[in-house]
UniProtKB/Swiss-Prot annotation:
EC numbers for this chain: 3.1.1.85
Active site per the UniProt annotation: 82, 207, 235
Protein name (database record): Pimeloyl-[acyl-carrier protein] methyl ester esterase
Native species: Shigella dysenteriae serotype 1 (strain Sd197)
Pathway: Cofactor biosynthesis; biotin biosynthesis
HAMAP family: Carboxylester (MF_01260)
Length: 256
């Protein structure tokens, strides 16, 4: 059985697991990990097939969640960014006793646009899948550029994301394709109506991948959850607004 790359730091009385997004790895959290580890016992994870978690092929969302959970603390706040938000949500649905609170960051329960639902057009996701086989490094870079577009620090933030990708070996094409397939097909809108733990959803007002118009729709669908929008952030608010991001998480800790 292959192991997930996992790093634990800090000695807070609350565990916080951080799950990164598509194409990236746990190095993306380095902009906030020192500060967070003074408040939490922090767990940095490379999702299966990404970063240092080698030897995994394409996986379903359920299998990815189970693989991550095998090395996790008994109970933690689970925070997932983008694709990682789906993994954290899946864990909250299947193992609620392990989840002290669920936090999703720039994530959607259904990334793909559907009838009366805003998201990424399916042909855009299919296009990324096609381009991966032609020039996957350039495709990943294009996807990263989309994530920071519109912010005051867009170039700087895009460079930070690119540096994270290039710091470690690139994921295999089938792993990247598998991640895109999850983004294209998964829809957790109805299942997440049933979670009972504290549920905080964080968004960037300028996010081009998760439109802000879904926020009030989910406020209505999930009245038990809370939402918070970073006014000048795009898809990676923890990179563009690290201090504000940390304050939001520390405030959550006081409540759970």
């Amino acid at each position: 059985m292959n192991n997930i790359w996992w790093q634990t730091k800090g000695q807070g009385n609350v565990h916080l697991v951080l799950l990164h997004g598509w194409g990236l790895n746990a190095e993306v959290w380095r902009c906030i990990d020192e500060e967070l580890s003074s408040h939490f016992t922090l767990h940095l994870v490379d999702l299966p097939g990404f970063g240092r978690s080698r030897g995994f092929g394409a996986m379903s969302l359920a299998d990815m969640a189970e693989a991550v959970l095998r090395q996790a603390p008994d109970k933690a706040i689970w925070l997932g960014w983008s694709l990682g938000g789906l993994v954290a949500s899946q864990i909250a649905l299947t193992h609620p006793e392990r989840v002290q609170a669920l936090v999703t960051v720039a994530s959607s329960p259904c990334f793909s646009a559907r009838d009366e639902w805003l998201g990424i057009k399916p042909d855009v996701l299919a296009g990324f899948q096609q381009q991966l086989s032609d020039d996957f490094q350039r495709t990943v870079e294009r996807f990263l550029a989309l994530q920071t577009m519109g912010t005051e620090t867009a170039r700087q933030d895009a460079r930070a994301l690119k540096k994270t990708v290039l710091a470690l070996p690139m994921p295999e094409v089938d792993v990247l394709n598998g991640g895109l397939e999850i983004l294209k097909t998964v829809d957790l809108r109805q299942p997440l109506q049933n979670v009972s733990m504290p549920f905080l959803r964080l968004y960037g007002y300028l996010d081009g991948l998760v439109p802000r118009k879904v926020v009030p729709m989910l406020d209505k669908l999930w009245p038990h959850s809370e939402s918070y929008i970073f006014a000048k952030a795009a898809h990676a608010p923890f990179i563009s607004h690290p201090v504000e991001f940390r304050h939001v998480l520390v405030a959550l800790k006081q409540r759970v």
